[in-house]
Amino acid sequence: MFANIGWGEMLILVIAGLVILGPERLPGAIRWTSNALRQARDYVSGATTQLRQDFGPEFEDLREPITELQKLRGMTPRAALTKHLLDGDDSFFTGKFDQQNGKPAAGQEKPVTPVNPPVTATPPSESTATPFDSDAT
């Protein structure tokens, strides 16, 4: 529940509570807040237990689409495309078409790259003039 609140934010909340409520009422406010959170957690767990008892095995059938939606929410666009359009084959994105799921294809070795001599660029000769078209400008 408080996964996004760090220690710095907690310290600021405590200092703000100390300033607003004062040192006399702050322990009572903390106690009341913790009791309210505990009671809310008990209500939620009780509702979950009651749903499981009422629905029985059908409760798991209700949970499956929800967990699938949670998986989709956490996906990146690349992972979603890979999963749904390409059936998990990400060679389109990685460029490794000869490999299946990160492993080399059966009976295939490392590809041999041909060695080509380096090509040197020749500087343009100064005697040739650059073509100029007065109508183009």
Swiss-Prot record:
UniProt similarity note: Belongs to the TatB family.
GO CC terms of this entry: TAT protein transport complex
Assembly and binders: The Tat system comprises two distinct complexes: a TatABC complex, containing multiple copies of TatA, TatB and TatC subunits, and a separate TatA complex, containing only TatA subunits. Substrates initially bind to the TatABC complex, which probably triggers association of the separate TatA complex to form the active translocon.
Organism of origin: Mycobacterium sp. (strain KMS)
Job description of the protein: Part of the twin-arginine translocation (Tat) system that transports large folded proteins containing a characteristic twin-arginine motif in their signal peptide across membranes. Together with TatC, TatB is part of a receptor directly interacting with Tat signal peptides. TatB may form an oligomeric binding site that transiently accommodates folded Tat precursor proteins before their translocation.
NCBIfam families, per the entry: tatB
Listed name of the protein: Sec-independent protein translocase protein TatB
Protein topology in the membrane: Single-pass membrane protein
Protein location: Cell membrane
